[in-house]
Amino acid sequence: MAKRVAGSKRYVHPLPIEPVVLPPLIAHNPLSWVYWVLAYVTSSNQLPRKIPLEVGADGRYTVTGREQMQYLWEHGFFGTGQLSRSEPTWQARTVDRLQLDTEGIAGHKLEQVTQLRRKQRLEFKRERASFERKRLELRRQGVLESEILEQERLWLKQLRDRELQWEASTGDPSPVRAEDAEIIAEDGASVLPIEKLELMPVEALFLTLALPVLHADAPAILARTLGPQPALPQIERLCRLYAAYHHYRSHGWCVRSGIKFGCDFLLYRRGPPFHHAEFSVMVLAPDERHDYTWYSTVARVVGGAQKTLVLAYVARRAAADQLAALWHARRYMEAFALFEVHELVYRRWLPGKNRE
Amino acid sequence: MTEAEELSVALGLHDSDAEEDALAQDWSEMAKLVKKANQHALPRRGEKDYEPDGTDAQALLLHTAKETMFGTLLNSVRGSTVKTLIKAYWEEEQRMARIPNARGSFTNTMGKVDKHGQCWLQLHEFVYLVERGTVSPYLALTVGDEKSNHEDVLLSVQDVYALFSSTEELDEFLVYAHLKRLGFIVVSTDNPPAHVTSFYPPLSQKSSASSNWFCHIHSWLKTPQNLFHVPLYHPLHFLLHRYTSSPQLYEELSQHIPFKKVPHDINELREERNNGILNPNVKQWKIAFNVWKPKSSFKKKTPGLPDFQVVVYNKDNAGQQFPTYDEFRSIFHRLDYRFDFLNELDVDDSAWDDYTYTDGMPTREFMQRNKIAPSQPHSGGDSRKKKARTYPQHIAQIRRLKSGFKSFILSVIDDGLVSFVRIAESDFGSSNIWYTPPSQTGTTNNRTRSDKVDV
């Protein structure tokens, strides 16, 4: 596993197909022409070996193999590690935790940090509750408000002191747990690769149809997602999602699942390690409508995370028959191209901030 | 991207509509302010208890807070002096209120004066002024046929509210009063000003169909290119093509899914207005109000283009449902306001005069003919605004995407509470945010391509 590498070095390619590097063509040097032509003919954008896609019994699309997972993550941030927050770091983390690697890797501790913070927060809440009880007690006894305030200050100070002390003292917790025996490999120096990279159905389609890097069969993927005899509304819904996904991907956005914020997609500039997502996309049909509570709820959740809500209305430009015909002829990309993306930005408007 | 740049992204983008408007009022401080009367800032509230804990101390705190709040309201001076009393008579026949001799600053933005010098108020204007205590409502009674024989019947606020004939009318009033109280200048679209200004040229000047023809030929010429094109998903594609940079790949990918390009500039706006074909079966939402930001130079007769346009939607009304996309399209098509995304016109009022039409003729010509002084460029404090902040290109691009292009305000009424949503057309398809690795080819040319912005 590579050590911590600067993002700009690690995430050089925004798409899983790497551009070919051709030698410089020098006009007055015929030898360079020959070399250039040779390089052109022998090079290819295609991967030497396509990445195999597995479809689990539960209908999930996964990629296994450390290199493959890493390749998809580093080339456009595709998929999510099943045992990680998003980047499949479980393996490295576990090796790190169990101290199996003699070199001792730092930098894969994102999840640990989260865990630690959650613990601290919980601790604080418990402390606060106990103080609230104490204050109630004091009030019942008829203690003056100013005195209670004094007590509160004292308590806050104590809390802060303890926190500082705790931060200084926390070392690594004892590394090995009982259940770890099952995941340590025979040689005792590594862990079993049980983490998989899971792809959204639209991601799997994109990497199979638009950018052929997955070794997979599109009809099989679709049959798995929609069932063997999908109804037209189901097909349309998938087409809409795919059209939106492809649209944003093709204009340079890094598109990831928006389930965390109750919407369909999140749009990142460049990728999650570099920026927070700036937009949340909800994919809708042009004639689709919900009650106002639906919109305001989504907008609240998204707005609370400092993102802008985009309502992507994906409209079908041709008759339903045409879509069905293309679908059954398995000309999926042409079917997707029947859809057109329209966008509205939904945002709360504050009169006070728009007065001048 | 350096950290400094990232920081500037964070600072530059999250400034405007942050959720920091939830300031509750502390009335005990307010009570002191009423006496001083000169200060306008409200102080922040103190710490809040979450639930009643049954202690006397808490009950006492609550009691004093309530006491000061009601005390503040009760003890301040109320009522109006007889000298400044303005009587407004409700004329049921016209469904308007009449003020025989109107005076006061409200006449700058409200009411219409007829040739007898009487000021006529719309129902919502009437109710708003009654609620404020600016006018006293009277019922105009005609005894027999004699107009002169008026008997003054003073109306109560309840009576005045009873004049609303439908829920829609009441909803519109709620929005009107809310925006009015916040200082905006609000004019109902039911009551157009004497001289209507439009961004769009009158229909007779509509450009001929020739541009359409041109488009056809243009698209025709493009087809041969497509004949030899092997799409990306074709098995042979990678045998025939070599991509030497990521933008080439993106270029190829973006061929597949079409997107709706929304108007970005003056010509596109006008073209869309002329050529846009809309589904006539779609519900036509009413654009209820034109709204101007507070300004002293407002003229009732020639107000010019509004700053915002408002559509009213009552969430609890079973007859109204949230608009679908087609309904949104129809609203966007009818919008006619100061399109704030037009950079070239953002400078001052006088620039807009060159691009708008009043009563069917260019506004500048109209003003000369009617001897109206041209709009003054904003003076004093606004000169600072002219030097609008300029952002680095990549931030400007995101800001543009976030604010969109044409927009309107959807005011949502929920149990009598008004909240606002800004709906804007956006266009992610017209601007690319490709990332190109800088080290790969070593040329600076690549870098500039990735920064390309079509705003």
Curated annotation (Swiss-Prot), chain A:
One of its GO terms (biological process) is tRNA processing. GO terms for molecular function: lyase activity; nucleic acid binding; tRNA-intron endonuclease activity. Disulfide bonds: none annotated. Keywords: Lyase, tRNA processing. It comes from the Eukaryota. The active site is at 268, 276, 307. It is an enzyme of class 4 (lyase). Its EC number is 4.6.1.16. GO terms for cellular component: cytoplasm; mitochondrial outer membrane; tRNA-intron endonuclease complex. It catalyses: pretRNA = a 3'-half-tRNA molecule with a 5'-OH end + a 5'-half-tRNA molecule with a 2',3'-cyclic phosphate end + an intron with a 2',3'-cyclic phosphate and a 5'-hydroxyl terminus. Constitutes one of the two catalytic subunit of the tRNA-splicing endonuclease complex, a complex responsible for identification and cleavage of the splice sites in pre-tRNA. It cleaves pre-tRNA at the 5'- and 3'-splice sites to release the intron. The products are an intron and two tRNA half-molecules bearing 2',3'-cyclic phosphate and 5'-OH termini. There are no conserved sequences at the splice sites, but the intron is invariably located at the same site in the gene, placing the splice sites an invariant distance from the constant structural features of the tRNA body. Belongs to the tRNA-intron endonuclease family. Heterotetramer composed of SEN2, SEN15, SEN34 and SEN54. Interacts directly with SEN54. This is tRNA-splicing endonuclease subunit SEN2. The gene is SEN2.
Swiss-Prot record, chain B:
Transmembrane segments: none annotated. Keywords: tRNA processing. Residues 434-447 have a biased composition (Polar residues). One of its GO terms (molecular function) is tRNA-intron endonuclease activity. Residues 366-390, 434-455 are annotated as: Disordered. InterPro entries: tRNA_splic_suSen54, tRNA_splic_suSen54_N. It comes from the Eukaryota. Pfam families: tRNA_int_end_N2. GO terms for cellular component: mitochondrial outer membrane; tRNA-intron endonuclease complex. GO terms for biological process: tRNA-type intron splice site recognition and cleavage. tRNA splicing endonuclease is a heterotetramer composed of SEN2, SEN15, SEN34 and SEN54. Interacts directly with SEN2. Non-catalytic subunit of the tRNA-splicing endonuclease complex, a complex responsible for identification and cleavage of the splice sites in pre-tRNA. It cleaves pre-tRNA at the 5' and 3' splice sites to release the intron. The products are an intron and two tRNA half-molecules bearing 2',3' cyclic phosphate and 5'-OH termini. There are no conserved sequences at the splice sites, but the intron is invariably located at the same site in the gene, placing the splice sites an invariant distance from the constant structural features of the tRNA body. Belongs to the SEN54 family. This is tRNA-splicing endonuclease subunit SEN54. It comes from Eremothecium gossypii (strain ATCC 10895 / CBS 109.51 / FGSC 9923 / NRRL Y-1056) (Yeast). The gene is SEN54.
